[in-house]
């Protein structure tokens, strides 16, 4: 891969083969790893994206105009995975800095770095 993924980009990921309740098939994911790691490592860290809308504090809603996706979706920061960059098929979109800040807050909640109030 010549162009490495960058934090805040949405990529189509080939999740196969999946195990248990992991994502399956080809689905979008948000790159959440820092860009130094994205440039140097053979892996990246992503958060799964789904059109199955469930409003939990760890989920971030994204509209099509914000994401490059066709449907209203959620970023599931409770499903953070390290994947090989070989699984990345194509870039679909880029989040705004404001939306990335929402994701940062949701990650803190998901990892227990901040309390739910």
Residue ranges, per PLM feature:
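Conserved functional hotspots at enzyme active or ligand-binding sites that engage polyanionic ligands
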Residues: 1-117
């Amino acid at each position: 891969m010549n162009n490495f993924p960058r934090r805040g980009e949405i990529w189509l990921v080939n999740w196969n083969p999946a195990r248990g309740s992991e994502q399956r098939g080809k689905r979008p994911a948000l790159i959440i790893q820092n860009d130094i790691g994205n440039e140097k490592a053979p892996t990246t860290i992503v958060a799964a994206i789904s059109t199955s809308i469930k409003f939990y504090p760890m989920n971030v809603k994204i509209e099509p105009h914000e994401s490059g996706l066709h449907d209203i979706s959620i970023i599931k920061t409770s499903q953070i995975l390290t994947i090989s960059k070989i699984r990345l098929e194509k870039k679909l979109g880029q989040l705004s800095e404001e939306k990335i800040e929402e994701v940062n807050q949701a990650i803190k909640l998901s990892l227990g770095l901040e309390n739910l109030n």
